[in-house]
Regions:
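Surface "functional belts" at beta-alpha junctions
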Residues: 1-82, 109, 114, 119
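Short, low-complexity, intrinsically disordered N-terminal peptides in bacterial proteins
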Residues: 121-123
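Glycine-rich phosphate-binding/hydrolytic loop that grips phosphoryl groups
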Residues: 78-107
């Protein structure tokens, strides 16, 4: 299993990759986020050089392996989290008192919606 500095990757469509840069500390069951970004595949591959990458998407994993092995990118195909996994993680956070008040939550919109991108300009 991946540990230390890990990039989590999801196919974002349009030739882009959602990339989360995390520090995994399995001995304390903690994860620290460094960044979450939307990158072109080229930017992602450059950023992933020498790092571990995890993804639940087989096609993305194969694409990264095909071009990333020479760059020292290690890819691990992981299971896609299901609702039971999400519930367990949420429960663990609640038990540790790691909660956020609803008014303190911040939405993380990484890119504009298709409607915003493809809408006709106002006249």
């Amino acid at each position: 299993a991946a540990r230390g500095r890990v990039l989590a990757a999801l196919d974002a469509g349009r030739g882009d990759v959602y990339a989360g840069d995390y520090e995994l500390e399995p001995h304390v069951r903690r994860c620290r986020m460094h960044s979450e970004r939307l990158l072109s595949r080229e930017e992602f591959l450059a950023d992933a050089r020498g790092k571990a990458v995890v993804t639940p998407e087989a096609v993305l994993a194969e694409t990264i392996r095909a071009v990333g092995t020479a760059a020292g990118i290690r890819v691990e195909l992981i299971d896609c989290p299901n609702s039971g996994t999400i519930a367990r993680l949420g429960w663990e956070h609640l038990q540790r008192g790691q909660t956020v008040r609803p008014e303190e939550l911040e939405a993380n919109y990484i890119r504009h919606s298709d409607a915003e991108i493809f809408s006709k300009p106002a006249v």
